[in-house]
Amino acid sequence: MYSNLQKTDKAVFDAVEKELGRQRTKLELIASENFTSLSVMEAQGSILTNKYAEGYPGKRYYGGCEFVDMVETLAIERAKQIFGAEHANVQPHSGAQANMAAYLALINPGDTVLGLNLSHGGHLTHGHPMNFSGKYFKIVPMNVRKEDEQIDYEEAAKLALEHKPKVIMAGASNYSRIFDWKKLREIADSVDAYLICDVAHYAGLIAAGVYSNPVPYADIVTTTTHKTLRGPRGGLILCKEKHAKAVNSSVFPGQQGGPLMHVIAAKAVCFGEALKPEFKEYQTQVVKNAKELSTQLQKLGYRIVSGGTDCHVLCVDLTSKSMTGKAAEEALDKAGITTNKNTIPYDTQKPFITSGVRLGTPAVTTRGMKEAEMAAIASFIDNVLNNADNEAKLAEISKEVTAFLGKFLLYTELN
């Protein structure tokens, strides 16, 4: 796949080869990461990267777009079929740009948005002051309850009545329970607000029917196309037909110029894969693995935020272990286990330190792991965190992890 690159730019080739080695030999537990198929990568690396195609299928500002029109139309129709949506825009370059386009399709700068608090599981684009969302809009944060760390819909309803938001932004980057989209629709309707649902983390699960679908309730649904969807890095917007024109205009020319046709082709491939029966089997296993990993860690004495998980992600509270998320991430990385530090609800630590570490099962499930392997992974994690300051022990565990992964081969076609 990389023979020409090897000949023409050895520096870049070497970096790619080293990253391939890292992906093969490290235990990938970052909840937002996954391993795409070679078909997705081939589409993304195709000659479609050469084509400019400003506009939309049948309405381009450039000639010679008849074949990229075919590709984009395929992606659109497959996305609509997967999620049961009336309209799909496959052009956003990222989830963040999809969110910006969604906001500006419905509201104006200065309007009020009700979104989930970042430290309670939300996302930067749901109102963080350093993000465009926090700079352009007046943000009212939703929270989770202290007692069970699940979304406080009663408080959200009161906040909506008090602040009269124009948009309720529902979604998360670190929330392990199932959103009540119907309840959020009712809250939005009570104050005549729009409902945007960001399902970047849950899209693959939704596509397979193992997580609730917000499309029937939301005005607009946004997502990334990687993570659980296991496609290329990019964004996707789904909406009611009545919002289609505003959404399309907000993406182009509002936020972007020419679409990345090679990425859209890869999205089409990804959506095609999501329509196959084996994709549902995969997503079902992702959830089973996350639940089992949560159970095994709890048996070892770890507290899981909200008491467990209903999806692909879980967050471990390390407070009782007198360890920060930053320290845990660093120790795990030395042992060949890739994770990310994460705040927990009502965290007393700074965002770059944190009291938690976030774990996810999409990537390990892609490698073929099932419940039995989750017990081994929990044991690895426990061994690392109990020996975080022992460099020799961490090196020993790293070798054990590499040997463990030898049974779950990755990208053998690239040898």
Swiss-Prot record:
One of its GO terms (molecular function) is pyridoxal phosphate binding. (6S)-5,6,7,8-tetrahydrofolate binds at L118, G122, H123, L124. The keyword Disulfide bond does not apply. The keyword Secreted does not apply. The record marks H226 as: Plays an important role in substrate specificity. Disulfide bonds: none annotated. It comes from the Bacteria. Its cofactor is pyridoxal 5'-phosphate. GO terms for cellular component: cytosol. PROSITE patterns: SHMT (PS00096). It catalyses: (6R)-5,10-methylene-5,6,7,8-tetrahydrofolate + glycine + H2O = (6S)-5,6,7,8-tetrahydrofolate + L-serine. One of its GO terms (biological process) is tetrahydrofolate interconversion. Its EC number is 2.1.2.1. InterPro entries: PyrdxlP-dep_Trfase, PyrdxlP-dep_Trfase_major, PyrdxlP-dep_Trfase_small, Ser_HO-MeTrfase, Ser_HO-MeTrfase-like, Ser_HO-MeTrfase_PLP_BS, SHMT-like_dom. Keywords: Amino-acid biosynthesis, Cytoplasm, One-carbon metabolism, Pyridoxal phosphate, Transferase. PANTHER family: SERINE HYDROXYMETHYLTRANSFERASE, SERINE HYDROXYMETHYLTRANSFERASE 1. Catalyzes the reversible interconversion of serine and glycine with tetrahydrofolate (THF) serving as the one-carbon carrier. This reaction serves as the major source of one-carbon groups required for the biosynthesis of purines, thymidylate, methionine, and other important biomolecules. Also exhibits THF-independent aldolase activity toward beta-hydroxyamino acids, producing glycine and aldehydes, via a retro-aldol mechanism. Homodimer. This is Serine hydroxymethyltransferase. It comes from Elusimicrobium minutum (strain Pei191). The lineage of its organism: Bacteria, Pseudomonadati, Elusimicrobiota, Elusimicrobia, Elusimicrobiales. The gene is glyA.
